[in-house]
Amino acid sequence: IANATGLHVPKNGLAYPSGSVDDIPHLMRPQTVGGVLEQPGMVEVVSCLDTNGKQIANDIRKGVWVCIEADTDYIKHCFEEYKVVTDSTGRYMSLYKKWHLIGLELGLSVASVGIRGEATGAARYFNADVAAFAKKDLPSGSILDGEGGFTIYGGVRPAADSLGQNFLPLGL
């Protein structure tokens, strides 16, 4: 998403804060106003599990969302008029789809390419890179088994950091 939209990623990877759909406007705002984001215009993931590993009610696990800041009083007033869920300041709200039907959406993307020659979700920027990180100490010469395996996990990092520190890409 970062590379398709121009959004940025957290310096040390995603934080995965726990929260319901109603918590998104509180969580997905800059740290300077009480949220988890290093700065405006970042990607993040919301965990559907609390810190004890229990399922959170009204979670967004199977959905997608975007958090929006009202940068004018008029927009803030619109949030109030439409009775959307906001943070305590009324300046941040989220739009979400409870279900992200990726299997059905894939067919639409393929059709868009085939019929209209229109790419969907294509990278236009290089803001983020998914790097491989060891799950445990690995001896030299270890064979990496890839995402979901026993040796490594993927962590998103700013592309400049990934290149500058010679991180191993998880996938190409």
Please state what every model-predicted region is:
Residues 1-172:
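C-terminal catalytic/substrate-binding lobe primarily of soluble NAD(P)-dependent oxidoreductases
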